[in-house]
C-alpha cells in the first residue's frame, strides 16, 4: 500500500510504500494488555514496618467488664487495633504482591503492530476523539526535512499546513485541574493527548515539538504500544517522517 508524502509547505512530494505492519489485524485486547504491562512495570513494590502499631505496652483486661476487649494503655485509651489511634493497619501493603502484568514478547510486538495499523484507520482515530477534518491522509507522512526543524513555531506552522492545529486546540482546551488529592501529588492537570510525532533518530525536532499541547515525540526504535495507544485506546493521530517509516520497516 502506498501513501502520499508531504513537504513542509503541504505540497505532495511523491509516494512511499508502507511496511506490511500497517495491514496488521486490529486486536484491541492485545493492545490493552501491552499498555497495562508497560504501565505496571513502573510500579514500585511497597510495604510497611512489620512491627508498626505493635510497639505498645497496652494489654487487654479480658471479658466481664462491660467494655470492648481492646488492648488499653494504663490511661484506658485503646491501642494496637486498627480502629485505635496509632494502631496497626488492618490490611497493610505487602512487598510480595505481584504488581507487574507480564506479557509474552511476541504478543507485545503483535500489539504494537496492531496499534500502528489502527493509527491508519480514520474511523478508529476519529472515535478516539481526534479532530481529523482536513488532514490530507492517514497515515500522515512528511518529508525527512521535518526532523531538522529547531523552533517550536516552525513545527506549529507545519501542523497548521497539514490541518493538525484543530487537534492541538482540542488538547489545549481540554487541560483541566483534577479533583481531589492528585493536585498535591505532582499531577495537578488532566492533559489530553494530541499528535504523536514519530521520527527516525534523535534530532532537533524532538525538543521543538514536545512543548505543544498534547504532543509527544518518539523515535521509531523506541516506539511502543503505550505511546501510540495511550490509556489502552488505539487510534492516536500520528505524524510519521520518511526516516521513521524506514526504521519501522526494519523492526517488523
UniProtKB/Swiss-Prot annotation:
InterPro entries linked: Ribosomal_uL4, Ribosomal_uL4_dom_sf, Ribosomal_uL4_euk/arc_CS, Ribosomal_uL4_euk/arch, Ribosomall_uL4-arc
GO molecular function, one term: rRNA binding
GO cellular component assignments: ribonucleoprotein complex; ribosome
Alphabetically ordered keywords of this record: Ribonucleoprotein, Ribosomal protein, RNA-binding, rRNA-binding
Single GO BP term: translation
SUPFAM superfamilies (UniProt xref): Ribosomal protein L4 (SSF52166)
Subunit structure as annotated in this protein's UniProt entry: Part of the 50S ribosomal subunit.
Purpose of the protein: One of the primary rRNA binding proteins, this protein initially binds near the 5'-end of the 23S rRNA. It is important during the early stages of 50S assembly. It makes multiple contacts with different domains of the 23S rRNA in the assembled 50S subunit and ribosome. Forms part of the polypeptide exit tunnel.
Name of the protein this chain belongs to: Large ribosomal subunit protein uL4
HAMAP family: Ribosomal_uL4_A
Organism in which the protein naturally occurs: Methanococcus maripaludis (strain C7 / ATCC BAA-1331)
Signal peptide: none
Family: Belongs to the universal ribosomal protein uL4 family.
Domain of life: Archaea
